[in-house]
From Swiss-Prot:
UniProt signal peptide: 1-22
Protein's name according to its UniProt entry: Integrin beta-like protein E
Membrane topology recorded in Swiss-Prot or TrEMBL: Single-pass type I membrane protein
Positions on the Extracellular side per record topology: 23-1875
Amino acid sequence: MNNLFKFLFVLLAIFCPPISDLVVSHGVPQQHITIIKFTTNFAFRTTFYKTSSSSIVIGEKITLGTLTFGDGSSTSVRASVTSFDTKNDWFFGQFIFTKTYTALTPNNSKQYLAMFTSCCRISTLLNNKDADWNITSSVYLDNKNWPSVNHSPVSGMLPIVQVIANKNNNFRVIASDPNVDDKLSFSFSTVYPMTQPSGMKINSTGHVFFLPTSVGLYSTQIYITDDAVPPAYAVVDFILESITEPGKCDPSCSNGGATCNGNSECKNCANAGSTTSNTCSTTNYPPYFVSPTPQDNQLIPFTVGQPNSITLSCKSDYTTRTVGIQAANVPAGAAIAEGTSSQGTVKNILSWTPVAANVGVYVTSIFCYDSNGLTSSSRSFTIFIAKPECGNGHKDPSTGKCKCDGDKWDPTSNCFDCSTGYYGQNCDPTPPCDKGIPNEGILGDGKCMCINGYSGDKCDVPLSQSCKDLKNSILLSTSVPSFFVNPTKVQLYIESDFALTTSLNIPQKLTKIDVFVLVDVNVASSTLFGVVQSSISTFVTEVSKSICETTQFGIGYFSDASSSGFNFAPGSIIGSNIVNTINGYAVSSYTSTSSGNSLLGATNAASNSNGWNSGSFKAIVVLTDKDHSSNSAAITNFVNTYISNSIAPVVVGFGASSIPNWNSAISTADFGYSTVSAATSIDISAKAVAGLKSVLSNVVYKTDNTTNGASFVKSTPSDVAVSSTADTVKTVSGLVLTKPSATSIVSPVASVSAIGFGQTDFSINYNRPPTPTGTAFSVNQNSFATFKLTGTDPDFNILTFAFTTFLTSDVGVITDSNNKDVSTQKSKYYDSTETFTFTPAINYLLPISVSFVANDGCLNSTTSATVSITINKVNQLPTCQQKTISPTLNVANKFVLSASDFEDATPFIQFTSPTDLTAYGTLTFGGVAVTSTSKIPTSSEITFTQTVNPTNAIDVPVSFQAVDSVGAISTSTCTLTVKLVHTNIKPVSSSTSPISVIPRGSVSLTLVSTDSDSTSAKFTIKSVNKGAKGDFYTCSTNDCTCNSTQTNIYTSISTTTTYTSISYTNKVANKLICFTNGEPSAISNYASISFTSTDNQGLESDSVNVVVNIVGNRTNVAPVVTKIQGYSVYQDYLDSDAHVVTGTDADIDDYNPPNVNNLIAIITTPPSNGILVTLQNGSIAATQGKAPFTHYYRPNPGFKGTDSYSYQVVDTFKAGSSIESTTVTVNPINHKPSVVVSSYSFTSQSGDGETQDLVTSDPDGDSVICSVVSIPSQIGMYDSDGNLIESVPTVLSGTSYSFKLLDPSKITPTPFTSVSSSFAVKCTDVTTKTIPFGTLSTGVVTANVQYTYINTPPTTQGGTVQLDQDTVKVFTFNGSDIETPKDDIKVKILSLPINGQLLINATGVALTTTNIASETYNLNALSYKPNAGLSNWNTIDQQSPLDSISYTVIDQQGLTSDSDIVYFSVRPRNPPVYTGARVIDVLQNTRYPLTITSRIGGGGSEVNIQVIGFTNNGTLSIAHNMGSEGTMDSEITSYPNQQSGSTSYNYAYMPPRNKYGNDFDFIYFKLFDGDLYSELYTVTVNVIHVNQPPTIELVSYKILDGVSSEVLFENTSLINMNINTTVLIKYSGNDIDVDQVTPLISMIPNFPLRGSLYAYNPTASNSSGAPITRNSSNVEQNADGFYYVVFVPSKKTSGESYARITFIMTDNGGLNSPIVGVLINVNTVNIAPFVIIGNKNYTTQTNLTASVMGVQFDDPDSTTNNVSIVVSIVGQKDDKVASLKDIKLSFTQSPMCEYHQTLASITCIGPKKPLNSSIVSISVIASTAGDYRLKLFVDDLGYNAPSAIRAQSHLNATGYVDVKVNAPEATTQTTNNKTVLTGAIAGAAAGTALIAAAAWKLLRKAAPPTDTFFSEAAFLGDGVNANPLYEQSASAAENPLYQSASDNTD
């Protein structure tokens, strides 16, 4: 078994760290009691895994088997090599695995049994050889006591511990416990049955005492447990190597000093003849450990993060020897620096700088060895690494927290785990990871886990590309150098026809050929089958000689018997000795009929797992004597099966004239070989060898049509001839793959087979059309939105997209990134990165959709997808229209301002600063003055009355806004432009009236026109009443000095007279006219004249009438004007004091009426910078009037300084006074500043609000300071510095301010709504003026602020949902919206998954396209269910997400998010798949090698098997292939039974003897991968009836002597009969076959040499019928169903083993039973002995000797042989032997006799003559009177019977002599002596058995060694009646010769 798996040592320890001990990587679930760390240590033979013991390296990973966890899950064990020993050929490995068990319910506990088990132990073990090993440990989970965790013990031993044979050895098993207070206890393991070494003991402290009695290997397993409750345990399993202690040859020997194991190995020694000297001395001391090597069981603490070292030192007392140290179970990461041996000493240094992850207990074992092969005892010590407070750091005393050693350690984990960006035990920097997530953390491996669409170590290789960029390419190929055909596996992409070359590498000398022979076991005769058996032997020999000597063979059978045939049954797998297999095959029947199933058998054989070797040429040789009769479908299946398995068929029809059907099938296949042969072993073998050579000579390529990608194979290579003289190394062309024109196969797989030589499997990728992904989004009314087109491609090609439908302009427009309308580029394809902008038509609200297709560079998608657009209705802000009006001064001007709103038919108008207009007049609506808060319905009349006439035309802008019904204000401000023009004020005409003129006198009068806005005037005379003698005239001299006679200068005035171009000076134009009259006396109202004045702009004043009175006739005195003293007024203020122009007139008394002041005051020069008005608040200019003429001075606006005006008084005679002037000083005052505050509106989408400015002004140029005196509600107002204004008043540092909305979710009463509010500002100037007042303010100015909340669309982010295959996963869409509670957000599905379903959680109903078109769902309302059996494994790269959907989320207001995608990553959960047969046909009484074949499930990693149950009619075993030692079956005795670590598992099924039938047994099993279990598979076992040979049973025999009874044979086949007798032999024949309906034929195959046989005739006198001879050997069945023969020995002959008679049965199938025989002893007759008694009665007295004479015996047929006699004194009833206390007897001579010690009995053995001499005189003396009998018992010991029955053939005889003993007469008493004697005899009863025993011992002593005797057990009873010495022969009553002697014998 050198090539077999050698298990040396396994230790399984469970380390259950508390939560603080665990170091977890990023993403690992939180630590818990259910997280268990397993540490397993293994030692195995290095050369089982490696080519040499030195080819292994530290750190190498080696797969060893499977560790099961007790919960149905397991993991593959890949141990990391930690140490090795090249000399002893072992390595030590460690495997650490962290297992998470199912969470426990509160206050609960659970126990699991972890196990590492397999077969087989090394076969050279002295105990437990070839047995399974079972290494276990218990896991106890208890969350009641968490985090107090009981850790299992930890131990370590050398894999092989050497001990000295036949000496006491003592060593210690070392173990430690992480729970340092736990006490450990050691014992032999009883966890699993095993045999511990004999002579080995272990105490509870771990001390082992071992005295091995043999040299060799022992295995042991030690159980180590702690004292916790419940306890935790571990086992350590290791090997003890018992060796002979080596010695040294004596120096006197020729090889003195050499190592020896015994004296014989020391040659030519001088002291060889000495009887006391030992030429091989064992005083040879091994090396030993010296200080500072740690002591056994020493605990050595190591510190995390610091270098630690241990010195190991070994010494030998022999300085010339080289010594070394071997260590085992060295912790991973620790290193041993080996020193150089010098002077018999060596030092090694074990060094280790442990990291935090190494916290724990480590037991390391060491031993010394020297160059002479001596080893020290092993020593073990414990390294204990305590958990530091700060793993890879230290505690900072200033903070009390952990400070890590560098940035790579994470302080939040107390420096036990890596920081982000680091991985592994040393927290190395993670490699670059471009498009992925690095596997970080202390348990991470640093690998980059790519996101979908990327690959490569750095995840920087995009998987996507354009189809047009792809060419035919091989993505991956696998070549196996040892295979004939390469590559074996190819993954490729096909765009068009692709020619692929393969290679052949067939050596001239083939070394790998597998041949499976399929034998037809239904042949015409046993002779022909014998030929077939011989041909197999010849075939194997010839193939090995002429083709390949390393060919491996297997064999199987089929039977074409018409009634009981079968298609296929395996015999033995490839690599077996098929010659032995076929020679051991028992044929059930021989028939010449055939069912023609040979082709079906060949198909089944090719489908079976026959143990083919990888890389071998595979052939099946079919040997059949009949042609097949299968139909075309079966032939097609045959061809496909051989192609798919790459097997070459060779068919030999032996003994058949032709096999045309087989020839046709091989021709159809176009490969293989068929021929016929003669029915001889030589020809059959020759034809089979020729066929094998034929299929080996040519490589035929065929496509496997059973694969789903067979249509992709366009052509296969042509046949290739295999060279017989050289290696066939060739590149083969002709294999062309193509893409079928129309295919939808997902992941096609094709296979091309080089028949027999191997095959190439193709995983094919090809371009498939992409799928566009619909999207949906929403856009706000009159806004815009951007979107992209998306899609998926199964081949990850880069996609472009094209629209297939387009929008019309009345709906909206879609533009690309270049702002081009896509509808104008209808054939354009856009990249996936293109961003489109959709702008809906103004106020368009209906849903919109457009369609598009995806293109992968080669193909358009077969369907289009839709972009669905929802336009969200948003409250549109109203708009207003500009307006211009041109009012008329002092005229009510009515106008209408226009505004519009999408929602409101009648929005409102609101002026933002109406004071801008009211400075020029009044602004009213409905009779009420308009303010900034007035809301005026649109289309309503507004009235403006201009009251201020500007000097020049000006445009007054007045801002206003539109406001809708919800208070939303238009974003833009409109302007009402009021065009104010200067209104020409008509002049005011005036003149003094009446005027007086003296009779015949003249008087002047002045036509006055006052006008403030004209430059010249025209006076028009409207009427003239001259009076009778009067005239109105003018003089060209501008005075009244001319008269009518002076016509040249005198002009009379008439109604047509006008005076033009009279300039205004100081707003006054004057025209002097004159009146003259000729009346002599005064006349009142004498004349009159009326006139108007017209300014140069055409306005005419009212008409003024001047009346002329003719008065008096006297001399007038001019009046005197009163001077007004200078005064002062305040700027911009009307003088509050009245001033009067008046005067005095000297001749006032001349007036009529007298004393009336008729003076006229005239303002001759008005003020230049102000006006004089007649009323304090009036507007009528004061020009003249009756004196006293009151007036007020009003300075012009803004004027300050001095002004003056002049004045005079005129009397009624127009006599004017002098003109006086008065100076007015206008003192400056402080003016009120002004501020313009605009209303403001902003939205939630316009940011936080723009900065606004106050427009301030001050007429005096003073600085203006503004304060906010009221703030808006729910809208934050910020000052010039950006600080929130929280209290009022607040002074602004500048004139700017801004607004921000406070938290929109806190708007009341409804969050996320619009807010209308107002704020107020008050500004003051900065002045030094105090009179008449100081600082002035603008007053409170209020403005509106409008915040319009525009609903924000929700947001979402796609993701990946992880779930397992064939499960349903409830998931939640990612969706958020600031306005909408999460529970109210809905999701709209845009596309359904392709490979699964979306289900409604509440109902389980699957969504359809109809559902998703109209319905929305809660974010958590759906679940995903993949289609059955589908997972990521079914994608092109077998790892991409299986499915995806596109979706969008919708808020409460109907706004939708951008669409996104949810991917469904379905973890493959494909259990392993059983690929073998579900029904097996097993031949009756035949072992069936059952191989459970399987394949790893898609995405899986391993295949394990668990046999669940078995119906147990037959026997199911695990078949262990022991290589050259054959196969060993170990019966499965309990279920479930589990195996791991392969994809095929070998079992053996054996039906019970002679049982058969369909559905005979059922084998139930599951395959599993980790915790993933397959369906329950059932293999149905049909046990096929095979004709069984009949059997013979010997029943009985009877001696035909008339008296003998029938004797059953029972357990013997021996007949004892006497000489000259006849025996009748009875036997039966049986056949279990139900088809055996006729009686079996019985024959006598071998006749006895002596005696005669006869048929049985019960009617004959001697029962003998016809003689049975060699020519007539049949024995007919009797009517009772039995067979009888009569045997008659030859007369007068006898002897042991006299004759042997054999019988055989033959069934109707021609099968013979095993031969059964009887052995007959013909014995001579043993003659019974007899007793001769002379005197039968004697009388004597007590204490007197009586001599009994004449007692003799004879045995007629005894001469010199021994006989036995017993002479005893018994009672009258012969029931008890008398005691020696009562009576004694003796012989005159007794050399052959033995006296009983307590009873009156003598036993003698010897020939009869000396015995008779001994009893010639028998002395009897009694001390007790009574009636006695002397008894002689004779036994001939059966010596004349055959020795075999001697013990049963004893004959005997008995004789009696009555002896009456009387008491002396003098002492005679009346008491009955018989009674006394009876009591004496009764007292002696206990001794009877002793007498018999003594007799037996004597007999045995005298018996010859070869004699057979009864055993001592015969004498163990209480009485003698059961003793054969005391019984008559059973034959004595049947034959007079055997009659025993009686009392009357003479």
